[in-house]
Amino acid sequence: MSSTEKLPTIASPQEIGSLAPLPTFTYAPPQRSDLAQLVALRVYVDGLSAQEPKTAAVIASSFVFNSSILDNTLRSAGIPQPEGPKTAVTTFATVDKRDGFSWAALECDYLIVADPIQYHLGEENQHLVTVLAQPVLEGTGIGTAYRRLDVSFPLQDGVTVYVYERTRDIAPEEYQAISAELTALYPEYAAQYHSPV
């Protein structure tokens, strides 16, 4: 240090009159533009159990719509969970090589399906979603067991969510068709896709 440079002055504790308060700021995460539609969907789904308990499965897996988004909508919007009936939402597995097919979804009273079909890892890694969502949306194959209710929920990014009511039991051959389709894609994971009937 040269003789012309000054050392910084440090105040003693007695010289500090008072500490400045910590700066105040608030941070609110961005709010979804479709939050009202998500709330309406959650309320509608729970209303399906008004007369008797019902079950549903969400057949979608993207950052726009998935089962966690449906489950947490009211809480994230700061809306208290209302008293009264609540439709039980069954877990639906969505990752091909990690998860087995969620056969319990085929026993649910309702399927909640997004159009276009929603993925977070790409269609090539989420055939579990496609194998059920596509025929339900198209009304073909196993999709003939479901009737689309007269309600839709438009979400962000051009996604629309529909609710389908199961109108009949799923036939053993429909279970087996799902098993065969998934096993053909991943023969080494056949045990994960084995039909229970």
Protein language model regions, located:
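C-terminal luminal/periplasmic domains and tails of membrane-associated envelope-modifying transferases
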Residues: 20-58, 63, 67-197
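Transmembrane alpha-helical segments
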Residues: 1-33
